[in-house]
Amino acid sequence: MSAFQRLRQIALAIILTWGWKRALVAITAGALSVLALAPFNLFPVLFITFPVLVWLIDGAGAGRYRGIPAAALTGYWFGLGYFVPGLYWIGYAFFVDADVFAWLTPFAVLGLPAYLSIFTAIGFALARLLWTKNATRVLALAASLTIAEWLRGHALTGFPWNAFGYALSEPLPLAQTASLIGLWGMTFLTVAIFASPATLIDRTPDRRVAWRAPAAAVALLIAMSIFGAIRLSLHPTTMVAGAKLRLMQPNLQQDAKFNYAAKTEVMKKYLALSDRASGPQSTGVRDATILIWPESAFPFFLTREADAMAEIAELLPKGTVLITGSVRAPDLPRGTPITRAYNSIYVIDHDGSVLAVYDKLHLVPFGEFLPYQDLMEKLGFEQLTRVRGGFIAGTVRHALPMPGAPSALPLICYEAIFPGEVAGRNERPGWIVNLTNDGWFGISTGPYQHLEQARMRAIELGLPLVRSANTGISAVIDPVGRTVASLGLGVEGILDASLPAAIPPTIYARVGDVPAAVLVALAVLLAVRRRVAKRHP
């Protein structure tokens, strides 16, 4: 039996399977697909798993449940297989305060994937609606899953974590296509490219026809690699003159970050670590013009603690500013009970004055606020941060002015996973500053995934990314995605680096998701045309 005959035999077995066996195949395909993401980045595995999706939808008309419902159910099983191992690390957050939250772990580890799988079910159902018996069905699947992923990134508050397009974030030349079409365009190409081998089993008068889609996919990968290599060569890393960064990674335990009694020890550690010499020629914090501390750095309201502000002023040499995360109290008269707060970024001058403030816009559901907050609190529920009343969302994203350096686009924590989070068309910043606290997720795949997704924002926009993380991974990344310097996960230390310079705005920075929308629209139109032609030859 030839290799082609074996492939056809496997495909037919998948097409004809139903019941629990079909669910098992879909779940397995989803679980294996996670290997394409950070930290594994084994994207060739999708050449195996995505053709299986095509064959499963091919067989959605067989068995007890037929057509669109069968495709939707298959998509749901695939989603569970993909999201449970891809997001298992969420469970770590519930053990930070285990006495209160540990019992919720199985509900979170299974509940969030169960919700997100609704979107893969929608994608499969839409694909089946557009399905054909030729290679066009691959484009139908690519368009449908891209629409579903876009919905996942926007519905309610949105959660586009581990979107399929991130499978092409490594190697770096392939990721450069994101500068043209963004994450959703990369999602379309990911599905179209890796699902294409499914057509090898198609019965055609000319066997060469069955090879057209896989050949086109390989050609596209080669073209993307060439484009990426050229783009990387055209944009070597250059630095902003006079802008010297120092990132402080304290590797602080989560319980200390929310324990007011530990404020003295926390502040002492930050000050000592920030002024630590990084080498024989280092003079500590005097080496830097911009010192950066991570998200929600303190177990107190920073600007309401005069001693802490004075210590920061004493630490900073003249000409050096501090960018730090901190909870921020609303502007209320002193003595007024504080029931809610902002998750904020401060820019603080060497004399202890606040130069700029940004309040986080995209809050984490159940982490920073509860849906139906008042009702949920009455029922005894609270968010992981245990801030009564929940955090307040900011109102506008604006660039932070930076003395001696270009202005910075602020992103706090998972705001970096949302493509298109740009300050404004007329306010292009010089770099992205991302403060985060991935200590919630321990030593797991979560922080690696988070970094990879933040790096995609740099490539999309042509802006360098500077990322300060409590427990790692802190990094300085240039505007085409090269890592200039980094500190690993679970490491305490400081990172000294120059600030990479931005490059001219990318096509994606100029037009946003228009190219991705065009790709999806063309694929849908082609699929509809093929279906109409089949019914009315």
Curated annotation (Swiss-Prot):
Catalytic machinery residues: 295, 360, 413
Swiss-Prot/TrEMBL GO biological process terms: lipoprotein biosynthetic process
CDD domains: ALP_N-acyl_transferase (cd07571)
One of the record's GO molecular function terms: N-acyltransferase activity
KW Transferase (keyword) present: yes
GO annotation, cellular component aspect: plasma membrane
Subcellular location: Cell inner membrane
Keyword annotations from UniProtKB, A to Z: Acyltransferase, Cell inner membrane, Cell membrane, Membrane, Transferase, Transmembrane, Transmembrane helix
Protein name: Apolipoprotein N-acyltransferase
